[in-house]
């Protein structure tokens, strides 16, 4: 379910519900810089960080996907609440959109 609440900021972009678990994901999209040492930001707002950290502390499954033209990187739990990664490291973690979709499906469904 795509979420948008103009009265309560910070809620994750999408909520997935399955027979195994629920999963809240915040999506970010970046154009990757050309230089390997340039940092790919994880631009979460303070409210987004607070919301994800709070739900994670409650035992809920949360994560951040930083997408780009080539695919995306999955940051489970609150690991996506950091400052970012150098392009070279980001590319090393990059998976395809199909792999991301399968990861999400396996996280919520038996």
Protein language model features and the residues they cover:
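A short acidic, often aromatic-flanked loop/helix-cap motif at beta-alpha or helix-coil junctions
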Residues: 6-10, 71-72, 95, 100
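Charged phosphate-binding loop/patch that engages nucleotide di/tri-phosphates or the phosphate backbone
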Residues: 88-110
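Conserved catalytic cores of phosphodiester-cleaving nucleases, focusing on short active-site segments
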Residues: 14-16, 20-33
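Phosphate/NTP-binding elements of NTP-utilizing enzymes
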Residues: 10, 22, 29, 50, ...
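Nucleic-acid nuclease catalytic cores
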Residues: 53-82
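Mg2+/Mn2+-dependent nuclease catalytic core
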Residues: 30-51
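Histidine- and/or cysteine-centered catalytic micro-motif in compact active-site loops
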Residues: 3-5, 28-30, 67
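Active-site metal-binding core of divalent-cation-utilizing nuclease and nuclease-like domains
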Residues: 1-20
């Amino acid at each position: 379910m795509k979420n948008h609440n103009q009265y309560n900021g910070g809620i994750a972009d999408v909520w997935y519900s399955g027979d195994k678990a629920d999963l809240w994901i915040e999506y970010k999209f970046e154009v990757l810089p050309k230089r390997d040492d340039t940092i790919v930001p994880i631009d979460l707002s303070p409210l987004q960080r607070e919301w994800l950290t709070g739900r994670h502390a409650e035992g809920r499954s949360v994560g951040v996907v930083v997408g780009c033209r080539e695919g995306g990187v999955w940051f489970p739990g609150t690991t996506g609440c950091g400052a970012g990664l150098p392009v070279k490291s980001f590319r090393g973690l990059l998976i395809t959109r199909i792999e991301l979709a399968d990861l999400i499906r396996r996280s919520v469904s038996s």
